Swiss-Prot record:
Gene: SULT1C4
Protein name (database record): Sulfotransferase 1C4
Transcription regulation as UniProt keyword: no
Keywords tagged on the record: Cytoplasm, Transferase
One annotated Gene Ontology cellular component of this protein: cytosol
Role this protein plays: Sulfotransferase that utilizes 3'-phospho-5'-adenylyl sulfate (PAPS) as sulfonate donor to catalyze the sulfate conjugation of phenolic compounds. Can also sulfonate estrogenic compounds, however, the dietary flavonoids (phytoestrogen) and environmental estrogens, like bisphenol A are better substrates than 17beta-estradiol (E2). Mediates the sulfation of doxorubicin and its analog epirubicin, two antitumor anthracyclines.
EC number assigned by the record: 2.8.2.1
InterPro entries membership: P-loop_NTPase (IPR027417), Sulfotransferase_dom (IPR000863)
Chief subcellular location: cytoplasm
Residues binding substrate, per UniProt: K113, T114, H115
Active site: H115 (proton acceptor)
Top-level taxon: Eukaryota
Amino acid sequence: MALHDMEDFTFDGTKRLSVNYVKGILQPTDTCDIWDKIWNFQAKPDDLLISTYPKAGTTWTQEIVELIQNEGDVEKSKRAPTHQRFPFLEMKIPSLGSGLEQAHAMPSPRILKTHLPFHLLPPSLLEKNCKIIYVARNPKDNMVSYYHFQRMNKALPAPGTWEEYFETFLAGKVCWGSWHEHVKGWWEAKDKHRILYLFYEDMKKNPKHEIQKLAEFIGKKLDDKVLDKIVHYTSFDVMKQNPMANYSSIPAEIMDHSISPFMRKGAVGDWKKHFTVAQNERFDEDYKKKMTDTRLTFHFQF
């Protein structure tokens, strides 16, 4: 779809945005069309960036980080929906606008969001020595969550059947590319830059400990009472009911929650309800090959 067609694009509940490649990574066409602007994004030293592979706990981490910065003031986080509070750097969606424009209009300090692999990160974020939080999730649960997200999100390609999507994901032919390369790229970068690398499974198992770790990285000293408050307000059940965090304000023509809610399970080990024995064996074999060159390890269940 050409750029002039995209400008006239309107969601009607059936159409989906087209995709293309940027430096070998699949992206929505609108992102490809403004790639030079994204690459040349000018960061500020006090910008805080939250980076994840899609469906690895991004929204959860955003809410936690903002509550840490606001020292547990829940009302401040209710001022606007998630997508308005945290500019999504590389995203441009008809009717919702551009993350770049949002970021430019936002006063400092800004909390920014990206799903970009490390090698495609706008250089100024590293040049300005910005603090970056990366969250990684085990690939089996990540795949399941991404599959259901693509079912309901018309801004991304239709995923096809679960069997088809399983193959697409393994091949890395999804938006934002290969999960394996994404988590490894950020892992390799973490000791060279101001990057705090967290795991979704650790956040589920011991949220208070991980929130404390985040607070220390951000530079906030929070007492136990505030930490407990943040744990409560960022729990899955509370966030699922929070209209400022559950994406229910996005028009149904773009995100159809009747197909699958944005916040579906938020669990560790849900993949076991989707993977067949044969798929699991195939996945494990593929995982072993692709992860031999890293010490990065994941928990697939508790």
